Regions:
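Structured beta-strand-rich core segments of catalytic domains in phosphoester-bond hydrolases
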Residues: 38, 46-95
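N-terminal, active-site-proximal structural segment of metallo-dependent hydrolase catalytic domains
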Residues: 1-50, 60, 65, 81
Length: 95
């Protein structure tokens, strides 16, 4: 079975401290879609990514605001960040 998990984490650092990574490792999804990451990619703790998963982040230009992430067990053919809108792509809402 192919499993997709989507979560509004309301802050990746907080969700990681509350056990997000362990829960994802137990549930073993193939794809994880995260909304409201609220961190720059460089500020996201390495332990927030389950072992063996690849990650792509689309962070908002405003620190601590919005942001999305895609984690996958297998490398996808293509990953697109943003959808070409100057107005909305700065909010980090599309992976």
């Amino acid at each position: 079975m192919f499993r997709i998990t989507t979560l509004n984490v309301n802050g990746i650092r907080s969700a990681t401290r509350k056990g997000l990574t362990q829960w994802l490792e137990q549930s073993k999804p193939d794809v994880v879609c995260l909304q409201e990451v609220k961190a720059d990619e460089c500020d996201i703790p390495a332990e927030s990514r389950p072992h063996g998963m690849r990650a792509w982040y689309h962070c908002a230009t405003r620190r601590g605001y919005a942001g999305t992430a895609l984690l996958t067990a297998k490398r996808p053919r293509e990953v697109r960040l943003g959808f070409g809108s100057k107005e909305f792509d700065a909010e980090g809402r599309y992976v």
